[in-house]
């Protein structure tokens, strides 16, 4: 419970996504006063829900792993852990114009795209990557050179390069090897913790329910939330107080705080925070972001039966096919099957200006090409979400290019997802980031 004390530090948390909520949670739990500012009318950011057809579910695809210990701890705190559903999933590959299952060792050995030696090189690369712990060294090597070295040129060109292009576009050539290492580590996390096999899960009701319970929990412990409030300026006065100016309900308002924690993307920090040093501004400006254009479909029938289908054939406008219907019980979607069709692009890509109708036509044509049994009359609803700043591009030596969490001005902290260097971007990793940094913020704020 928060400490009722007039002298307790007053914090403004910029951003009501999962990172901002988790930061507010830890500040509140140590007795600080917290106000969250969120420009949207709902909390959650990339984890927020929306309505598609007659179903309310996650705007972007998310899944919980058994090995996601930080997320599972939060769900226990919110009393949602008993409402988890766990399933085993299947993985597919679309290669050489056909769907292939790679959900077991036997299926991997039968995979026709690679010969036995290439499969050995691929398997050895993944196994070797799972044993590595020194991600700092991998940061100084390009992902292409590392994968070519361990998997060989032919395996790289048949498997790794198409997957990297789907996820990163041509930017994969500037990406460090710790990027793929982090994915391998997440794949093997369950085995390292003693589990025989990874399980995928979700909370009944999706992130709409998680966020509702999280917001209620924070409010009941004294955290204030300013939703639908666009922060326009953050300044520090001579008395070292921080002043947050924001627009809400058509009016300009200001609140004052002892400290500010910015959990928003780097371009947004640059836009609204005054007084950043030249070094801080340069580092924030050099952060490149990947965004996503993600089309959701509610179908009357399932597609291929794989949770994720990776695409290695050229010329497909998708990063992959995510069939949430393979995980969710039918009653969660009113008997429908939810499919996500994401496409990751750089934040300045023209895809963000493309009309939704054009995107939908391309997605439907792609499904017709991949799944001969698919018919357009099976689509109950279709709509597209776009986010320009999803993941910072992990370039060579990326960890040394970031801003420190503690800014040069006392009381200002820069804690956004661009700080993640040794993990993939997911909710559990965001929570882990907060756990690793919150103590330093506390010490710095009381220095």
Show where each model-derived region lies.
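Conserved Rossmann-like nucleotide-cofactor binding loop
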Residues: 19, 42, 267
């Amino acid at each position: 419970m928060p400490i009722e004390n007039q002298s307790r530090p007053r914090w403004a948390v910029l951003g009501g996504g999962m990172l901002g909520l988790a930061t507010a949670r830890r500040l509140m739990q140590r007795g600080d006063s917290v106000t969250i500012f969120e420009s949207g009318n709902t909390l959650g950011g990339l984890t927020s829900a929306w309505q598609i057809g007659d179903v309310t579910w996650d705007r972007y695809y998310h899944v919980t792993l058994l090995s996601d210990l930080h997320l599972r701890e939060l769900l226990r705190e919110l009393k949602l852990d008993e409402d988890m559903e766990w399933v085993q999933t299947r993985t597919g590959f679309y290669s050489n114009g056909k769907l292939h299952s790679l959900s077991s060792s036997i299926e991997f050995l039968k995979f026709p795209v690679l010969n036995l030696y290439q499969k050995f090189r691929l398997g050895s690369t993944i196994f070797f990557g799972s044993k590595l712990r020194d991600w700092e060294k991998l940061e100084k090597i390009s992902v292409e050179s590392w994968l070519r070295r361990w998997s060989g040129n032919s395996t790289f060109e048949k498997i790794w390069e198409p997957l990297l292009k789907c996820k990163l576009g041509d930017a994969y050539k500037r990406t460090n090897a710790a990027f793929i290492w982090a994915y391998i580590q997440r794949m093997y996390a369950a085995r390292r913790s003693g589990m025989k096999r990874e399980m995928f899960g979700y909370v009944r009701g999706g992130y709409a329910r998680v966020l509702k319970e999280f917001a209620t929990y924070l409010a009941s412990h004294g955290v204030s939330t300013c939703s639908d409030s666009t922060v326009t300026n953050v300044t520090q006065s001579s008395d070292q107080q921080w002043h947050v100016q924001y627009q809400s309900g058509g009016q300009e308002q200001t609140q004052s705080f002892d400290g500010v924690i910015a959990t928003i993307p780097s371009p947004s920090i640059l836009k609204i925070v005054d007084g950043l040093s030249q070094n801080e501004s340069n580092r924030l400006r050099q952060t490149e972001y990947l965004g996503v254009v993600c089309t959701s479909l509610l179908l009357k029938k399932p597609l291929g039966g794989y949770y994720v289908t990776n695409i290695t054939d050229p010329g497909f406008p998708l990063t992959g096919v995510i069939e949430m219907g393979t995980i969710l019980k039918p009653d969660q979607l009113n008997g429908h099957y939810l499919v996500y069709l994401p496409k990751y692009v750089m934040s300045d890509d023209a895809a963000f200006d493309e009309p939704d109708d054009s995107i939908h036509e391309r997605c439907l044509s792609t499904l017709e090409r991949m799944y001969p049994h698919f018919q357009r009359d099976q689509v109950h609803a279709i709509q597209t979400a776009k986010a320009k700043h999803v993941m910072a591009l992990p370039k060579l030596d990326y960890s040394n290019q970031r801003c420190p969490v503690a800014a040069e001005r006392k009381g200002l902290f820069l804690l956004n997802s661009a700080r993640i260097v040794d993990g993939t971007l997911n909710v559990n990793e965001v929570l882990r980031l907060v756990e690793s940094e919150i103590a330093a913020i506390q010490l710095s704020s009381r220095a």
